[in-house]
């Protein structure tokens, strides 16, 4: 019986570790850039505010999911930055954050945003958002350039619609 209880406890402990959500680093912007360069990963920034309801929903219901944590922890150096305090104020200005939550994916070498998304997202949309930041033909920078150039290829239009929906830009996503 003791062995059974021990094995069950061990199983529960392993399940808890395996289901870990996003591990946000608690460090400065300079430290995050250094870590990202060393780990050869882009930086994922969750810009939030204390008063933002959708930010709280993402923090409690999406960032804590094991599948989300596994993907984001494997592919990004993750930061949570309060856009109204400390260095968050300047970083929010730098990346033109105008609503919350806003998710910015940054190349640590150039410090340029490679993908920007936001709004309250479900698990699938948030995983798509992260995957898009890793695919040069699905980043917001590329999609916006293609949209301005008048690209009308069906595969582009589908990617652009998904991106617009992830920005909660209903008018653009329904075009």
Labelled PLM ranges:
Residues 22-27, 47, 58-88, 97, ...:
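Thiol-based oxidoreductase modules, predominantly thioredoxin-like and allied folds used
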Residues 19-39:
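N-terminal leader/targeting and pre-domain segments
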Residues 136-175:
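Non-globular targeting/processing and membrane-anchoring segments
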Residues 52-55:
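Hydrophobic heptad-repeat coiled-coil signature
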Residues 1-21:
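Bacterial Sec-dependent N-terminal signal peptides
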Residues 39-50:
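Short active-site neighborhood of thiol/selenol oxidoreductases, capturing the structured segment around
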Residues 34, 42, 76-79, 101:
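Serine-hydrolase catalytic core recognition
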Residues 98-139:
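Non-catalytic, surface beta->alpha helical segment in thiol-disulfide oxidoreductase systems
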């Amino acid at each position: 019986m003791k062995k059974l209880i021990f094995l069950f406890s061990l199983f529960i402990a392993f399940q808890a570790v395996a289901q870990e959500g996003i591990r946000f680093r608690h460090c400065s912007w300079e430290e995050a850039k250094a870590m990202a360069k060393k780990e050869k990963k882009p930086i994922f920034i969750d810009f939030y505010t204390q008063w933002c309801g959708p930010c709280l929903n993402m923090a409690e219901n999406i960032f804590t999911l094991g599948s989300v944590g596994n993907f984001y922890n494997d592919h990004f150096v993750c930061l949570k930055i309060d856009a109204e305090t400390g260095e968050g104020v300047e970083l929010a200005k730098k990346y033109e954050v105008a609503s919350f939550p806003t998710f910015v994916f940054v190349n640590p070498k150039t410090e340029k945003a490679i993908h920007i998304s936001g709004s309250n997202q479900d698990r699938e949309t948030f995983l798509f958002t992260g995957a898009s930041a890793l695919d040069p033909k699905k980043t917001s920078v590329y999609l916006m350039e293609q949209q301005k150039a008048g690209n009308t290829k069906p595969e582009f239009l589908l990617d652009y619609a998904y991106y617009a929906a992830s920005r909660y830009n209903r008018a653009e996503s329904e075009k």
